[in-house]
Amino acid sequence: MSTTIKPILLLADSQLLFWRDEEGLPFLQRARTLMEEDDPGKAFKAAYLGASNGDASEFYELFLAAMGEIGIRDCRHVKASPSSEDRQFLEQADLILLAGGDIDRGWQAFEASGIQQKLIERYYAGALLIGISAGAVQLGLKGWNEESRQLFDTLRLVPFVVDAHDEPSWARLSQIVPKAGEHTKGVGIPSGAGAVYHPDFSMEPVRHPLVEISQTEEGVRQALLFPGETHEVEGAAEQVARPRVVSPEEAISLAMGALTPEDDKVN
């Protein structure tokens, strides 16, 4: 499996899963092309994480249809409480999609299962990550509880706070960015749009303009980022998460735990 770090696809909703550009090419073909560059001819595996929507089967069916459009047939719905088979598939997945839904609900499930650390590891091992709505938020710096608006750290693989389909005012993101830490920026992705975040810390809007929100001395500032242009993300290197370094002792402990049958483990 390739270890080339790939772009992250951030989608406001599922529209881009089936959208075709002016030349008639599926947007998701970009994902297929990126994987083919490293492993031409491989039968790719695609994992769907539906914890944020309560593992609703109808959204997984949409995922299967989208993967079929780009010729990926080996797919699996990795549940909020993943089985050993789910974990094994995720370890081998070339493409991983974080579904939309409730940001906090999904994040709590990721933390409870340890999936959040595995996603960071898979990203740095070369898997291509896609986040839709809540999933896109979880790939960024901060998530929040919808009722209390309490902030919490998320995967931090994308060096800004993400929000989706809250246009035109982006009031929620405008309130969150000043609370998220000094120099933190936010990116709002409107309905039907997306963003491609590249490993060189640049970002590419897709289909519709994005809104970048930052805190200045004069207050909250909004700027439009247009498709067809590449935008540098300032301070990205200091913001993004890095793979966790495991000590030799911890590696042995994890390996021994993996070899222990589930029925023999102490609850």
Residue map of PLM features:
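Conserved acidic residues
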Residues: 44, 94, 159
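A short, well-structured beta->alpha microelement
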Residues: 73-87
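Short helix-loop-beta junction
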Residues: 62-75
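Structural alpha-helical scaffold elements that stabilize or flank donor/cofactor-binding regions
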Residues: 88-89, 154
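Structural motif
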Residues: 10, 95-99, 130-131, 161-162
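C-terminal and late-domain segments of enzyme folds
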Residues: 2-41, 50, 54-61, 65, ...
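A short, aliphatic-rich alpha-helical micro-motif
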Residues: 90-91, 123
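Class I SAM-dependent methyltransferase SAM-binding "motif I" and its flanking Rossmann-like core
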Residues: 105-111, 115-172
